[in-house]
């Protein structure tokens, strides 16, 4: 079954523009856009053909301004200056190295007798460092220190653990909602934490007014639920019994879908 395409009044009146009528306008706009592009890029022209060949050879697209070659004069002048300047620091370094060597030779000629005298003392010191004397008192002190550290660490960890507060059995047995007669009973709230406070009275001491209020709320909830169900069923019946009206030429699509007149 082929469905017939419904055409609105707008679709009948306004059709797609024909190419014959708007071809010249389109070409004029295209020419204008190209001329504007040339004007905007006049300060820095971009040659598309050269750019493509460069990317094919090098693999990177770089603007032409960066590829400019500097004049050869500056390149020739720089190495000449460096050639003139470089030998001076090299000569200075050679003279300094020669002076340092002469000083070292003079010092070595004067030092040997002092080194011979100091040599045995150095050997004794090294021997002491290699074989330190075992002192029993120091060993016992070290052991005692390690034990005391362990004990202190155990004490610190124990102090961190907080003791669990004992549960209040009266609080568990209390009624879930605040009671009307709770204000009449004096309670010692100074010793208790005030957050999440439950009622002071037990379930045996609930006032009759509180129970009546509870039953009233439950009845109201049931009535509301019943009303919602009735409204839902009434809407379904209306939609079923709704008669589809005949075609009305004066009723627009908006009125048919969203207006209250059609309902």
Swiss-Prot record:
Disordered: region residues: 50-207
Bias type Basic and acidic residues, positions: 67-81, 116-131, 165-175
Gene Ontology CC terms: axon; axoneme; centriole; centrosome; ciliary basal body; ciliary transition zone; cilium; mitotic spindle
Signal sequence residues: none
Biased composition (Low complexity): 85-99
Main location: cytoplasm
UniProt KW Cytoplasm keyword: yes
Single GO MF descriptor: microtubule binding
InterPro entries attached to this UniProt entry: CSAP (IPR029774)
Function of the molecule: Plays a role in embryonic development, including proper left-right asymmetry formation. Also required for proper cilia beating. Plays a role in microtubule (MT) stabilization and this stabilization involves the maintenance of NUMA1 at the spindle poles. Colocalizes with polyglutamylated MTs to promote MT stabilization and regulate bipolar spindle formation in mitosis. Binding of CCSAP to centrosomes and the spindle around centrosomes during mitosis inhibits MT depolymerization, thereby stabilizing the mitotic spindle.
Protein's recorded name: Centriole, cilia and spindle-associated protein
Taxon lineage: Eukaryota, Metazoa, Chordata, Craniata, Vertebrata
